[in-house]
Amino acid sequence: MNSSASSQVVSQRTSPVVSIVIGMAGTGKTTLMQRINLHCVEQGLRAYFINLDPAVASVPFAANIDIRDTVNYKEVMKQYKLGPNGAILTSLNLFATKFDQVIGILERRADEFDYIFVDTPGQIEAFTWSAGGQIIHELLANAFPTTILYITDTPRCKSTTTFMSNMLYACSVLYKSKLPLICVFNKTDITPFSFAQDWMSNLMTKLLIIYVSFSFLDDFENYQQALDQDKEEYMTSLNRSLSLVMDEFYRYQPLNSCARL
């Protein structure tokens, strides 16, 4: 094969897509990662997994790159005399200083996989609002097509206030990262997604991993009815105003739901 033909093959190669999994503590990010990993193995999908949680006791999925192999979370606590959250933040910042090496590995092996999944610390602010988290997501976005998966706890989102709080936080992450963001409603095996579907219109569904529904909030009538059932007048009024203010965010924001098998 001559050099021109070789360069044409390289130029036609599809770059792997990065999905950064974030969400509040307890929303099931790592469990979802484990199910994604299992699905990829069962379906023969070429995927690469990265763990960025330095404090996790054990990773329930096969991580190709693990921050714990580079940074010792407990030693960071001792050396810098930090608490748990401070040590997580510092560990992530230390790892970020070497993340260009991770990018180099991913670029060299880019033809070996189609998807890259990145699990983040349980404390969402440690990644989304830290210098280390910003460095990592910017390096990934500069090298590969990158999307943020914002995981929400479906049972807790039955509360209209919690639902609105999650959407506000998702909007702030979208605004700060400037990356495509998909809201994923997790734990639908515990609480069905029907209540959220009633708050949405133009619903389209498709099978992705377990169950995924792409939705766009285009009509707030059902959400307004749910607000009417709340007893706190101040919160009801605030949520009603916020739902209208954020109309443009809802209108074009893809929402997914998933459950464990």
Regions of interest found by a model, annotated:
Residues 2-8, 16, 54, 73-81, ...:
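N-terminal regions of ATP-driven nucleic-acid and macromolecular assemblies
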